[in-house]
UniProtKB/Swiss-Prot annotation:
Binds 4 [4Fe-4S] cluster. PROSITE patterns: 4FE4S_FER_1, 4FE4S_FER_2, NIR_SIR. This is Coenzyme F420-dependent sulfite reductase. Its EC number is 1.8.98.3. [4Fe-4S] cluster 2 binds at C428, C434, C468, C472. It comes from Methanocaldococcus jannaschii (strain ATCC 43067 / DSM 2661 / JAL-1 / JCM 10045 / NBRC 100440). Optimum temperature is above 95 degrees Celsius.
Amino acid sequence: MYEWKLNEIVDSGVCARCGTCTIVCPNGILTFDERPKLIDECLRKGHGMCFEVCPRVSSAKYQIKIREKFYEKYYYAKSDIEGQDGGVVTAFLKYLLENGKIDGAIVVGDECWKPVSLVVQNAEDLLKTAKSKYAISTLDALRKAGEMGLEKVAVVGLPCQINGLRKLQYFPYHAKHDLELGRNGKPVKLPKIEYLIGLFCTEKFRYDNMKEVLSKHGIDIEKVEKFDIKKGKLLVYVNGEKKEFDLKEFEICSGCKMCRDFDAEMADVSVGCVGSPDGYSTIIIRTEKGEEIKNAVELKEGVNLEEIEKLRQLKLKRFKKEVERRRENNEYVSFYWTADYGGIGKRADGTYFIRVRAKPGGWYKPEEIKEILDIAEEYNAKIKVTDRAGYELHGISGFDVEDIVLRLREKGLLTGSEGPLVRATLACPGGGNCSSGLVDTTELARIIEDNFKERPAPYKFKIAISGCPNGCVRPQVHDIGIAGVKYPKVNEEKCNGCGRCAEVCKVEAIDIRGETSYTNYNVCVGCGKCIKNCPNEAREVKEEGYLVYVGGKTGREVVEGVKMKLMSVDEIINFIDKVLVVYGKYAEKPQRERLAAVMKRVGYGKFLEEVKELMKKEIC
């Protein structure tokens, strides 16, 4: 047996048997026969892409969800194509093929009902695969499609397979690097997955076990015409007759007990029979690409949502029961579902931390702090205050992460601000709290949070607001930095040259000549102290507002941001939005290139000019 990092997942029975790991290995040394297996020595011992796409290592759902912006629209339909429960999936794939949306479809065919992964490129071959198989299947055909030179495909898969393929689509965002290179210096060749079509699934069965059980009842699996699952029964159609079997007679894949996804939550469109009339399929549209199914079949409203929710809860109940069983028996659990939520990270000691996204300006209500303290005491956790005024609970068991996250939500405390997204806005106390504050930093932080909270970005994206040019929160070295400023002018009729303004000016930008004070605007930083301290009200406001910096950073390299002109609140929101758009356009290496690096590579002038043009279009 070769050393392989995924052995713990596979051998412990946590493996979903989705087959995603086998298709991404650039060296082709993984095979799949109802479970993945390493057939040759791996130079990195499995510390690579096979591990990083595994949906049982981490779901990566949160990072995927904020990028796909999933929603749910429920319909039911049937087509004029003979297939499982109305042939909806077949009809959709037929539409995509005939309209050039895809070059091929990755579907499951069968050899005597043993699932076989197939590449289908025409409607005629598609019809031959139009019935459900309930045994463990693979995704081998996706790799074959790449070798055939196909560029765009749709994939039909079970919830676990959809999860693995979504992780493949967004690989750099959660793995923090590009695809693994093989011994030939190249990554695996795969087509672009344009559409993910998910199938409802409660469990899947071992093929050999299905064959054996049916044989005991005098049924030759080779003569079965159709399988279906309804109300806890496996329906087997042979010679025009329907026979029912209790699902408990069949051995389900052990990893299915660790699954909590009934309806393929990360698919573009999910399809199944639950919740719709006989002969129809329920359709859940989740993305804009999923909306295209409307061009293939006529959709009807009126899905029985209670039936779907019942199956969701049954699967979740089974999952929780299995997790608890493993906990009691000290068996391996991967805690893959903790990645369903933002702000969760694994510590060096194997426990977890939960980051509470900082409230706007770092201001908390007493009851919010009390809740954090109560949780820390109850779960024996340590508390860390982050440099962005957030709270982290450390030393949390993986078994408790989800319960704590949901409990925090009930108190209005959002977990997040971790990964390639807009982090919590850092702000000093600001005007009304600090004697030097010129602007209300808390209100501006709230507006920014309302517009950009957890917005996805190529890499972490940090914003800081300082109430004055003192810059105690270092706005110059943030992706976006904002500082309140107030520049003075002199009312010569009121000025008597007393010199008080020059005394309070920390940058020595003021000279007194006779009975008048003069400001050197090349030195003045706009702190407004001279205006505030003039006993004769001779210092007035020449210009005030928000000074903005863009493209700063700290870390391995310190970069000071480019200073922009003064902006209003509306202009700041427009500016941040367009900076994120242009950043996303030019970033080539997700999780590797901060905004500063992209601006430098593209050219500061070109980058900012494009931002300005987009801002103008917004205004128009």
